[in-house]
């Protein structure tokens, strides 16, 4: 326990383990700042952010500014008199006026090994790009996009078949552990902030649904990485008989054919030709249907070798 007045800023499930860790350590979390409640899912039911739920379970006051950069939002946070602000996956850019409020600055927990993968979606992009290692970095925030001085890093391997959901769950715990270590070592005066080398950076922009469209002319391993990095959201997809087909689990194989051509169908999956090699789709979801293992899908949908997956209304694969 540091004894500091801490304001916690975060929104999604990824931030919850870090907030719980602060609470379990007995830290004085004087308020939680999170995004407004928003409609979610098919029913568009208005739901609170996961971080808000955790805060309310522990009786911590919650602020939900629509725009944290507005003067009234900044003054409300200033009125909390924080010694430190901890930020993890908050979802809005913090202005300098807010960063300057706490006595000991603002610490961000970022889900990559900075300076690589600055930006909103580091978990997705490190998998899409075929990385075999990633990690978490704590840093002192400045006005740039994940450009602040680094405090600590902790790395973790990425499994060959691991998707974003699995990596998310592990990294959220890793981030909580690293923040606790960061606070302890800062209190002992053991940490010296390290400048980032901008020459080594790459960016991880926010994911868009259209990023999930599979180009079957690409290499099979590259498409597998895309599927892994897009699962569970926004989802990798193609089209079958002009219907959207989401693809969730695949394995590489050595088949050949026209890109997007269905090579075989069986209990183990649906093999589809790529630009180089092939992919066996093990789990999928056709538009308007449930997510199913390939064998169960084929029991209700008559798919034949020689068919094509590709863009909607296309007569050939992408």
Swiss-Prot record:
Recorded GO MF terms: methionyl-tRNA formyltransferase activity
Keyword match Transferase: yes
Annotated InterPro entries: Fmt, Formyl_trans_C, Formyl_trans_C_sf, Formyl_transf_N, Formyl_transf_N_sf, Formyl_transferase-like_C_sf, Met-tRNA-FMT_C, Met-tRNA-FMT_N
Enzymatic reactions: L-methionyl-tRNA(fMet) + (6R)-10-formyltetrahydrofolate = N-formyl-L-methionyl-tRNA(fMet) + (6S)-5,6,7,8-tetrahydrofolate + H(+)
Sorted UniProt keywords: Protein biosynthesis, Transferase
Binding positions ((6S)-5,6,7,8-tetrahydrofolate): 112-115
Pfam families in UniProt: Formyl_trans_C (PF02911), Formyl_trans_N (PF00551)
Enzyme Commission identifier(s): 2.1.2.9
The family this protein is said to belong to: Belongs to the Fmt family.
HAMAP family: Formyl_trans
PANTHER family for the chain: METHIONYL-TRNA FORMYLTRANSFERASE, METHIONYL-TRNA FORMYLTRANSFERASE, MITOCHONDRIAL
NCBIfam families per UniProt: fmt (TIGR00460)
Function, as annotated: Attaches a formyl group to the free amino group of methionyl-tRNA(fMet). The formyl group appears to play a dual role in the initiator identity of N-formylmethionyl-tRNA by promoting its recognition by IF2 and preventing the misappropriation of this tRNA by the elongation apparatus.
Protein known as: Methionyl-tRNA formyltransferase
Protein's organism: Citrifermentans bemidjiense (strain ATCC BAA-1014 / DSM 16622 / JCM 12645 / Bem) (Geobacter bemidjiensis)
Source taxonomy: Bacteria, Pseudomonadati, Thermodesulfobacteriota, Desulfuromonadia, Geobacterales
